[in-house]
Amino acid sequence: LFCRRGFNIDSLTVSATNDPSVSRITVTLRGTEQALNQLILQTERLEVTRQIFELDPDKSLQRELLLLKVACDAGNRAALREISSIYKAKIIDLSPDSMVFELIGKPDKIDAFLKMFTDYKILEQCRTGVTALERGGMHQHMQKPPQQVRSAQLPLPGTNCA
């Protein structure tokens, strides 16, 4: 469905929810407002879709996890620790020749953190993809009784869809 409509998926996460019969899929993608509306309408028609809705980026919480392994030695270890401290990243592994950082934050924070490593040798990196919830109480779409909806949940947040 996404490929046929020409959408480029930036991020896709799937997770369990407090309801064991429901999985939550969060898709981050770019497209025109018209194309996003069309995608929402078509996804609603899928048999497995319980709900689909757009989260306003200004009214939602978005987070992503980055694991980053960087080559290091005695000469650059202090500088790498300083970058880690500025971004509040955790050093979760340290060896004589590498450091592994863990950073949780908004995608733009992750991007900015990664830009700080352009002069260092990145050995490995892995990003989880964005997951999101609406701020405050229960999202208005989540208040529908289960019998009024079908069988799975596909939240599709904002134009940046996180």
Language-model segment annotations:
Residues 1-23, 28-162:
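Long, contiguous binding/interaction regions
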